[in-house]
UniProtKB/Swiss-Prot annotation:
Protein name listed in UniProt: Uncharacterized protein MJ0572
Keywords tagged on the record: Repeat, TPR repeat
Gene3D superfamilies cross-referenced by the UniProt entry: Tetratricopeptide repeat domain
Intervals holding TPR repeats: 8-41, 42-75
A Pfam family reported for this protein in Swiss-Prot or TrEMBL: TPR_16
Upper lineage: Archaea, Methanobacteriati, Methanobacteriota, Methanomada group, Methanococci
InterPro entries assigned: TPR-like_helical_dom_sf (IPR011990), TPR_rpt (IPR019734), Ycf3/AcsC/BcsC/TPR_MFPF (IPR051685)
Domain of life: Archaea
Length: 86
C-alpha cells in the first residue's frame, strides 16, 4: 500500500475519533490532511462535508459532498472498467 494512502487513513481515523468527541474543528483539520494525502479518499470528503455542515459552513459542505460523490463515481467507473478487462 502506498505510504500516502496509509497516512491518509491514519488522519481520517483521527478525524473520526476527535469528531466523535466533539472537536469538530480538529476533525476538519485531520480530514483536510487525509484529503491532501489522498484526494480520492471518498469517506474523508463525506466526513469533511459533515464537519463543515456542523460548523454552519453549508456551501463548503455542499461542495465537499459533491466532491465525495465525484470520487465515488470515478472509483466505481475505474473498478467497473478493470473488471471488464479480466
Amino acid at each position: 500500500m502506498d505510504e500516502n494512502i496509509k497516512k491518509a487513513e491514519y488522519y481520517y481515523k483521527k478525524g473520526v475519533e476527535v469528531g466523535n468527541k466533539g472537536d469538530v474543528e480538529k476533525a476538519l483539520e485531520y480530514f483536510n490532511k487525509a484529503i491532501e494525502l489522498n484526494p480520492f479518499y471518498r469517506d474523508a470528503w463525506f466526513n469533511k462535508a459533515l464537519a463543515l455542515r456542523i460548523l454552519g459552513r453549508y456551501e463548503e459542505a455542499r461542495e465537499c459532498f459533491f466532491r465525495g460523490l465525484a470520487v465515488e463515481k470515478h472509483l466505481t467507473h475505474k473498478k467497473y472498467n478493470s473488471d471488464d478487462e479480466k
